[in-house]
């Protein structure tokens, strides 16, 4: 089984930057995308945009050469999650995610659903603890350990299930690399260049700090999408990361 994404339009990038597309308007999103270069980043499409504009929007981004992280955080019974992940793979996305709190059977089913896709399978990542969550939020759910402890517990379960990595906060990255190894990919939201506002992400870090901490892919949103010159902003961040590599 192979994905439907066109390999001829895909442009390979070695940038760790994933730009979060958080737009309410399709035309505005595409106008932004047409200002940037797929060699400088990948793109993340989340629940709102995918619900509004559907798979065809993902295809339009792919036709422009971009790798897509489909950030839908599947969390369901194992069979349903597996079918959803397979549908994402058939769409040809570069990365897809599930909630680790869905449990081992769900994550294993999702991983096994990607086996028929072979080398065309997307990276399968699990969400540990959302970056907006604090200890008090977890306590409301009956979780008495800290966000960092809970994230590490879920990351360990994710690795046991054979997934490619986790979404985690940058503060957890150093420990996770030590605990789970270099091949276990770390995807981190809440990354903001120096001087950017924190927004609704509580646990934040600069791109240079994230790279030094062991983050493999860093999700950056408004500091790029709201920049007066997003193409130059991306080039500046990439250059700063190469300088720290």
Swiss-Prot record:
<keyword id="KW-0456">Lyase</keyword>
<dbReference type="InterPro" id="IPR001754">
    <property type="entry name" value="OMPdeCOase_dom"/>
</dbReference>
<dbReference type="InterPro" id="IPR014732">
    <property type="entry name" value="OMPdecase"/>
</dbReference>
<dbReference type="GO" id="GO:0044205">
    <property type="term" value="P:'de novo' UMP biosynthetic process"/>
</dbReference>
<dbReference type="Pfam" id="PF00215">
    <property type="entry name" value="OMPdecase"/>
</dbReference>
<comment type="subunit">
    <text>Homodimer.</text>
</comment>
<keyword id="KW-0210">Decarboxylase</keyword>
<feature type="binding site">
    <location>
        <position position="131"/>
    </location>
    <ligand>
        <name>substrate</name>
    </ligand>
</feature>
<dbReference type="GO" id="GO:0006207">
    <property type="term" value="P:'de novo' pyrimidine nucleobase biosynthetic process"/>
</dbReference>
<feature type="binding site">
    <location>
        <position position="22"/>
    </location>
    <ligand>
        <name>substrate</name>
    </ligand>
</feature>
<feature type="active site" description="Proton donor">
    <location>
        <position position="73"/>
    </location>
</feature>
<feature type="binding site">
    <location>
        <position position="192"/>
    </location>
    <ligand>
        <name>substrate</name>
    </ligand>
</feature>
<keyword id="KW-0665">Pyrimidine biosynthesis</keyword>
<feature type="binding site">
    <location>
        <position position="44"/>
    </location>
    <ligand>
        <name>substrate</name>
    </ligand>
</feature>
<comment type="similarity">
    <text>Belongs to the OMP decarboxylase family. Type 1 subfamily.</text>
</comment>
<dbReference type="InterPro" id="IPR011060">
    <property type="entry name" value="RibuloseP-bd_barrel"/>
</dbReference>
<feature type="binding site">
    <location>
        <position position="201"/>
    </location>
    <ligand>
        <name>substrate</name>
    </ligand>
</feature>
<dbReference type="GO" id="GO:0004590">
    <property type="term" value="F:orotidine-5'-phosphate decarboxylase activity"/>
</dbReference>
<feature type="binding site">
    <location>
        <position position="221"/>
    </location>
    <ligand>
        <name>substrate</name>
    </ligand>
</feature>
<comment type="function">
    <text>Catalyzes the decarboxylation of orotidine 5'-monophosphate (OMP) to uridine 5'-monophosphate (UMP).</text>
</comment>
<comment type="pathway">
    <text>Pyrimidine metabolism; UMP biosynthesis via de novo pathway; UMP from orotate: step 2/2.</text>
</comment>
<feature type="binding site">
    <location>
        <begin position="71"/>
        <end position="80"/>
    </location>
    <ligand>
        <name>substrate</name>
    </ligand>
</feature>
<dbReference type="InterPro" id="IPR047596">
    <property type="entry name" value="OMPdecase_bac"/>
</dbReference>
<dbReference type="InterPro" id="IPR018089">
    <property type="entry name" value="OMPdecase_AS"/>
</dbReference>
<protein>
    <recommendedName>
        <fullName>Orotidine 5'-phosphate decarboxylase</fullName>
        <ecNumber>4.1.1.23</ecNumber>
    </recommendedName>
</protein>
<dbReference type="InterPro" id="IPR013785">
    <property type="entry name" value="Aldolase_TIM"/>
</dbReference>
<feature type="binding site">
    <location>
        <position position="222"/>
    </location>
    <ligand>
        <name>substrate</name>
    </ligand>
</feature>
<dbReference type="GO" id="GO:0005829">
    <property type="term" value="C:cytosol"/>
</dbReference>
């Amino acid at each position: 089984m192979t994905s439907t994404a066109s390999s001829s339009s895909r442009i390979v990038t070695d940038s760790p930057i994933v730009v979060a597309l958080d737009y309410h308007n399709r035309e505005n999103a595409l106008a932004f995308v047409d200002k940037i270069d797929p060699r400088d980043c990948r793109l993340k499409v989340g629940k709102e945009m995918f619900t509004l504009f559907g798979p065809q929007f993902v295809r339009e981004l792919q036709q422009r050469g971009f790798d897509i992280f489909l950030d839908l955080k599947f969390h369901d019974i194992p069979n349903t999650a597996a079918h959803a992940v397979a549908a994402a793979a058939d769409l040809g996305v570069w990365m897809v995610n599930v909630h680790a709190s869905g449990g081992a059977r769900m994550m294993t089913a999702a991983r096994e659903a990607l086996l028929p896709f072979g080398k065309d399978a997307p990276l399968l990542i699990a969400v540990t603890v959302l970056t907006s969550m604090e200890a008090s939020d977890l306590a409301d759910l009956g979780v008495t350990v800290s966000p960092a402890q809970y994230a590490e517990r879920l990351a360990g379960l994710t690795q046991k299930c054979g997934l490619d990595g986790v979404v985690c906060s940058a503060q957890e990255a150093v420990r996770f690399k030590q605990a789970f190894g270099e091949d276990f990919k770390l995807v981190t939201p809440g990354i903001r260049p120096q001087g950017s506002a924190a927004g609704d992400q509580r646990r934040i870090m600069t791109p240079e700090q994230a790279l030094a901490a062991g983050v493999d892919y860093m999700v950056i949103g408004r500091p790029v999408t709201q920049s007066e010159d997003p193409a130059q902003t991306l080039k500046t961040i990439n250059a700063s990361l190469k300088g720290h590599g």
